[in-house]
């Protein structure tokens, strides 16, 4: 009763309200731990921690220099668009910064050789190949709650098959089972993800809705829960092929930030993914350098500081591969011009209504 008495307002004076608020906060701190409730501006502006995506352009497009820590991220797109490649680049960047990464391989399709080529330290990568969706999400929950893992990648949502479906007959109809599993798991995971400051990346596939006449017929698997819980949603698409004479050596890729709770969304960036190499950093430096006006492009010729550095983008890339100091100088100039580039990357809003 004494606690209730302390909280009771005896008048409408500001002093009485302030004392009542302080008593309430003290009671909450005793019950749930210090810092359970705090004033947002109490410690000044808190900078959002992030981990680089491995793509300079995407880091700029995200507005905070990478993917935000302590948040749920969704990377989705068609088959062979670069979803897993992008996720592995984030893992590599996390490890370079001294972090611990885990990969929940629900598809049982992780290629260790390819991951190594992208810069992933295989000796320190935690890998799980679960038998069903419940097991995959329980493993994720345990890793996050440990507070010792900086990033968990789940590849993919479509492969998180509920146990009831695996144990049932091949033709059994079990509508909404996976959606309920995802909804329940995300309700449980979200608070611990934020508390542990862990990034959890869900890789997702695209399906087509039947009979849609208006709007986009595309949707992602696993129901709507992930769309709501994700702080960042990245739509990745292959836009073309990179050829060396008749041989295809890579893909042109476009990534659109369709949802961003930590910075302005709807920014779009393009980069190259080279086979056996991953995201082409030099290709990005050239493209972003041109966007920022750091590199001059006249016809097929590229110039930096009034000196020609090559004819054709591929030749410039080879030139910068040899001249690493010059490449580093241009990259530093691009990073300084990130605000100008951000404005260049802004595109229209969502094309359909399922991004909340």
Curated annotation (Swiss-Prot):
UniProt-listed GO biological process terms: DNA recombination; DNA repair; SOS response
Predominant localisation class: cytoplasm
Disulfide bonds: none
Gene3D superfamilies in alphabetical order: P-loop containing nucleotide triphosphate hydrolases
Subcellular localization(s) per the UniProt record: Cytoplasm
Keywords on record: ATP-binding, Cytoplasm, DNA damage, DNA recombination, DNA repair, DNA-binding, Nucleotide-binding, SOS response
NCBIfam families reported in the protein's UniProt record: tigrfam_recA (TIGR02012)
Family: Belongs to the RecA family.
Biological function: Can catalyze the hydrolysis of ATP in the presence of single-stranded DNA, the ATP-dependent uptake of single-stranded DNA by duplex DNA, and the ATP-dependent hybridization of homologous single-stranded DNAs. It interacts with LexA causing its activation and leading to its autocatalytic cleavage.
Protein name from the UniProt record: Protein RecA
Organism for this UniProt entry: Caulobacter sp. (strain K31)
């Amino acid at each position: 009763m004494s606690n209730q008495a302390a909280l009771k307002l005896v008048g409408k004076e500001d002093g009485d309200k302030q004392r009542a608020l302080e008593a309430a906060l003290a009671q909450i701190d005793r019950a749930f731990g210090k810092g359970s409730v705090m004033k947002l501006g109490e410690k000044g502006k808190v900078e959002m921690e992030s981990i680089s995506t491995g793509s300079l352009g995407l880091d700029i497009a995200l507005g905070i220099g990478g993917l935000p820590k302590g948040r749920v991220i969704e990377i989705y797109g068609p088959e062979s668009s670069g979803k897993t490649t992008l996720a592995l680049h984030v893992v590599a960047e996390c490890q370079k910064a001294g972090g611990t990464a885990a990969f929940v391989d629900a598809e049982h399709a992780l290629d260790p050789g390819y991951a190594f080529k992208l810069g992933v330290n295989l000796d320190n990568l935690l890998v799980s190949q679960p038998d069903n969706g419940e097991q995959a999400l329980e493993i994720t929950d345990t890793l996050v709650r440990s507070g010792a893992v900086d990033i968990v990648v789940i590849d993919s949502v479509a492969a998180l098959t509920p146990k009831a479906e695996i144990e049932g007959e091949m033709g059994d109809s079990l509508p909404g089972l996976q959606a309920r599993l995802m909804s329940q798991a995300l309700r449980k995971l979200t608070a611990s993800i934020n508390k542990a400051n862990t990034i959890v990346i869900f890789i997702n596939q695209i399906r087509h809705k039947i009979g849609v006449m208006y709007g986009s017929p595309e949707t992602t698997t696993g129901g709507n829960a992930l769309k709501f819980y994700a702080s960042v949603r990245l739509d990745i698409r292959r836009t073309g092929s990179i050829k060396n004479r008749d041989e295809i050596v890579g893909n042109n890729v476009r990534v659109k930030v369709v949802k961003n709770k930590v910075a302005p969304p709807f920014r779009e960036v393009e980069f190259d993914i080279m086979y056996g190499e991953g995201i082409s950093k030099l290709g990005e430096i050239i493209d972003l350098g041109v966007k920022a006006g750091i590199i001059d492009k006249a016809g097929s010729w590229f110039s930096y500081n009034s000196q020609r550095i090559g004819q054709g983008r591929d030749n410039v890339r080879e030139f910068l591969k040899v001249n690493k100091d010059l490449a580093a100088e241009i990259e530093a100039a691009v990073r300084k011009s990130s605000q100008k580039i951000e404005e260049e990357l802004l595109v229209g809003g969502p094309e359909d209504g399922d991004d909340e």
